[in-house]
Amino acid sequence: MTIQQYIDNLNRLYQTGNAREHSYRGDLQTLLSTLLPDILVTNEPARIECGAPDYALTKGKHNIPVGYIEAKDIGVKLDSKILKEQFDRYRLGLSNLIITDYLTFEFYRDGEKVKSITIGSITGSQIISNPEQFSEFESLIRNFVQTISQTIKNPQRLAEMLAGKARLMAV
């Protein structure tokens, strides 16, 4: 599946007026599986310590996690205060994370946003692609799954990581 086909599929569903967050999941899974043939993209993976992100991306015969994706419905503001608690939990607990509304993708590494890219936008009652962003999106996605968790090299970094985990346990 190309990115344009992905946007076209989202648009078809969006225009029905009755599609919701879960309606688009199969299309994102197919797109990611096409762009990342060596990665297993699991929709609705088993719950983990910090919650239940919508997708887990794993690789190798031992299915080693390389990243997670949390998706919200198209048009949902990703900076919404209503979502803050959940997103904070994921940012603290997951070293490699994407938060998306299926059109905008926010890339987080070790809790910090490193990049945001929009491959489509709502115009009137339809979704219009932003093809000038497709190449960069592909590059960002491929780099996302190449990330290897950092080795702890100093006590301050260890303390920061443990503090984040402790906050998760206190919730």
Region spans (language model):
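Charged, often low-complexity linker/regulatory segments
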Residues: 1-47, 165
